[in-house]
From Swiss-Prot:
Domain of life of the organism encoding this protein: Eukaryota
Annotated Pfam families: Ig_2
Protein name: Low affinity immunoglobulin gamma Fc region receptor III-A
Ig-like C2-type domain span: 24-104, 119-172
Gene: FCGR3A
Length: 249
């Protein structure tokens, strides 16, 4: 009984710890940021994830097909065939979430690091030209209404996203004597995240085991004190019978 109590307590402590076998997911980082480029643009994907000592190999997948084992994956001149889903994995990480690459054909492309923003986040839109040709008289539009004009090619910056920034955006500018427009991109602004119990989800697999251990601990403790009372009562009964025997003539 004395040995059972400490072992149960140790099991309770161990059950609260995350499993050491769970590996973090690798993360794909793209340069330039976002997932929209024009043909002949260069793109670099970097895989963030731990590797065993002395082993720096990385698995790169394009649409599910293994394409490289280098630390990073470089596309020198993008083509439409490079569009698709990219994932990576290192020696001490799980396969990353997919990152989409869209390779577009055109003179201008509206680039954004993401299409869904939370309220309060900054928004940066860039009017990118094919082969980085100079662009003049750049205009940015939201829902076909002009929002910004510049003689040079400067970005459209919104310090804090609000609901009125939802909409369809595109840019227009002069490349030489050509008046070109980009395709439209839908920008979505979401409200602030609602607090929830999702942070507890990683620990749900451990909760049933912890509950069982707690019940065992309670039962063991109850048995221990019940045994102590039983021994104490037995000892008192034995002492009383001994005293009564000495008083006989």
């Amino acid at each position: 009984m004395w040995q059972l109590l400490p072992s149960t307590a140790l099991l309770l402590v161990a059950s609260a710890r995350p499993q050491a076998a769970d590996l973090p997911k690798a993360v794909v980082v793209s340069d330039p940021p976002g997932n929209r480029v024009l043909t002949l643009d260069s793109v670099t994907f970097t895989c963030q994830g731990a590797n065993p000592s002395g082993n720096h190999s990385t698995r790169w997948l394009h649409n599910g097909t293994l394409i490289s084992s280098q630390t990073s994956y470089f596309i020198r001149a993008a083509s439409v065939e490079n569009s698709g889903e990219y994932r990576c994995q290192t020696g001490l990480s799980e396969l990353s979430d997919p990152v989409q690459l869209e390779v577009h054909v055109g003179w201008l492309l509206l680039q954004t690091p993401q299409r869904v923003f939370q309220e309060g986040e900054p928004i940066r839109l860039r009017c990118h030209s094919w082969k980085n040709k100079p662009v003049w008289n750049v205009q940015y539009f939201q829902n076909r209404r002009g929002k910004k004009f510049s003689y040079g090619n400067s970005e459209f910056y919104i310090p804090a996203a609000r609901s009125e920034h939802n909409g369809s955006y595109f840019c227009r500018g002069l490349i030489g004597k050509r008046n070109e427009s980009s395709e439209a991109v839908d920008i979505i602004i979401q409200g602030p995240p609602v607090p929830s119990t999702s942070a507890l989800l990683p620990f749900w697999p451990h909760i049933p085991f912890a509950v069982v251990m707690a019940l065992l601990f309670a039962v063991d403790t109850g048995l221990y004190f019940a045994m102590q009372r039983h021994l104490h009562n037995s000892k008192r009964a034995w002492e009383n019978s001994k005293v009564s025997w000495k008083q006989d003539p």
